[in-house]
Swiss-Prot record:
Pathways per UniProt: Cofactor biosynthesis; adenosylcobalamin biosynthesis
A Pfam entry, by short name: CbiN
Organism annotation: Methanococcus maripaludis (strain C6 / ATCC BAA-1332)
GO cellular component: plasma membrane
Main location: membrane
Gene that produces this protein: cbiN
Keywords: Cell membrane, Cobalamin biosynthesis, Cobalt, Cobalt transport, Ion transport, Membrane, Transmembrane, Transmembrane helix, Transport
Descriptive protein name: Cobalt transport protein CbiN
Length: 97
């Protein structure tokens, strides 16, 4: 395996493990990883308690786990599309050379 591939693999491992090590167990009870939607909703209610949303979602997932699953599925589909694009362009470039 080439040295640049080893460096890339090590970089991915470090980038994956660094947040897990840095934030292991910190802030879970305070909603540290709560998300932007919840924080924005809380801020809107703090600024204007009488605010009423313009519309409601037509379907809401029955649990947080299903919501996370749908989000992960959306991310996986996006990653597959991006990976296909890069693979297609690399194969096209290799065919020219």
């Amino acid at each position: 395996m080439e040295f640049k591939h080893v460096l890339m693999i090590l970089g991915v491992i470090i980038l994956t493990l660094a947040p897990l090590i840095m934030y292991s167990g910190l802030g879970e009870d305070e909603g540290y990883f709560g998300g932007a939607d919840g924080a924005a909703g809380d801020l809107i209610m703090e600024i204007s308690p009488n605010y009423e949303p313009w519309f409601e979602p037509f379907w809401e997932p029955p649990s947080g786990e299903i919501e996370s699953l749908l989000f992960a599925l959306q991310a996986a589909i996006g990653a597959m599309i991006i990976g296909y694009f890069f693979g297609y362009n690399k194969a096209k470039y290799d065919d020219k050379n």
